[in-house]
Amino acid sequence: MKKVLIIGAGFLQDFVICKANSMGYETYAVDADPDAVGFKHAHHHSVIDIVDEKACLKYAMENCVDGVLTAATDYGVLTAAYVSQKMSLPGLKYKVAQLIKNKYEVRRCLCEHHVDDTEQTYEINRNTDVGYLTQILSYPVM
């Protein structure tokens, strides 16, 4: 039986755990919440923070998983990519996962490649001159 690690075991990942079970996979789940709903359905689970890449990798290696994924959360994307890359499993490259986690970079990339209707992107931080920015923006903004 193939083993799959699901990064996250909350309400939004529970469906994935149940689906993997129904497809015949042996499911492993990690989540920082000891009462995560998905733990009830996973064959195996461990209370591990899903942003702790090294701890998740250790758990995956100890259990010789054949695949790793996350669903419906940005928090587990980097960890899933990290684990899959370190274990030579199929998955997102870590650099792609980093891009996905950075909403500004996603919007900038989409804008540069004319993938959506974004015509302007700005990254805002504590050093941003908001007064100047309000003058140059095209409205409405989101």
Region locations from a protein language model:
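Active-site nucleotide/adenylate-binding loops and adjacent lid/helix of ATP-dependent enzymes
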Residues: L99-M142
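ATP-binding N-terminal substructure of ATP-dependent carboxylate-amine bond-forming enzymes
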Residues: M1-K95
